[in-house]
């Protein structure tokens, strides 16, 4: 299992817009073959910080995800909302 944890920080006045933009990516991603989880999390201490927990069966499923229209649209629309670049950590899922 291929797991990615993405951190995204957005401007104070862009939180609702981020949620709207990311909802479309979430809804498309959970329908992809090979997707096991796609959780969108908000930091309760820092409401402008979000984490995306993505679990796919393998790297090929991740590669496919990055070709989808919902992913490409989300990445494009996120750019002006973020305070800086997204950060990612990749893990091997052992015990889901």
UniProtKB/Swiss-Prot annotation:
Gene Ontology MF: a single term: (4S)-4-hydroxy-5-phosphonooxypentane-2,3-dione isomerase activity
Every ABM domain range: 2-91
EC number(s) per entry: 5.3.1.32
The organism's place on the tree of life at top rank: Bacteria
NCBIfam families reported in the protein's UniProt record: PRK10486.1
Function: Involved in the degradation of phospho-AI-2, thereby terminating induction of the lsr operon and closing the AI-2 signaling cycle. Catalyzes the conversion of (4S)-4-hydroxy-5-phosphonooxypentane-2,3-dione (P-DPD) to 3-hydroxy-5-phosphonooxypentane-2,4-dione (P-HPD).
InterPro entries per record: ABM_dom, AI-2_Isomerase_LsrG, Dimeric_a/b-barrel, LsrG
Protein name: (4S)-4-hydroxy-5-phosphonooxypentane-2,3-dione isomerase
Reactions performed catalytically: (2S)-2-hydroxy-3,4-dioxopentyl phosphate = 3-hydroxy-2,4-dioxopentyl phosphate
Main location per the UniProt record: cytoplasm
GO cellular component annotations of the record: cytosol
Organism this protein belongs to: Salmonella typhimurium (strain LT2 / SGSC1412 / ATCC 700720)
Top enzyme category: isomerase
Regulation: induction: In the absence of AI-2, repressed by LsrR. Induced by AI-2, via release of the LsrR repressor.
UniProt keywords, alphabetically: Cytoplasm, Isomerase
PANTHER family: (4S)-4-HYDROXY-5-PHOSPHONOOXYPENTANE-2,3-DIONE ISOMERASE, QUINOL MONOOXYGENASE YGIN-RELATED
Pfam families named in the record: ABM
Subcellular location: Cytoplasm
Oligomeric form and interacting partners: Homodimer.
Family: Belongs to the LsrG family.
Highest classification ranks of the organism: Bacteria, Pseudomonadati, Pseudomonadota, Gammaproteobacteria, Enterobacterales
């Amino acid at each position: 299992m291929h797991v990615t944890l993405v951190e995204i920080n957005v401007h104070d006045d862009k939180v609702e817009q981020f949620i709207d933009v990311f909802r479309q990516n979430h809804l498309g991603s959970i329908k992809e073959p090979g997707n096991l989880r796609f959780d969108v999390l908000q930091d309760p201490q820092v409401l402008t910080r979000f984490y995306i927990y993505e679990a796919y069966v393998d790297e090929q499923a991740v590669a496919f995800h990055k070709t989808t229209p919902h992913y490409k649209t989300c990445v494009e629309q996120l750019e002006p909302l973020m305070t800086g670049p997204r950060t990612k950590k990749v893990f091997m899922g052992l015990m889901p």
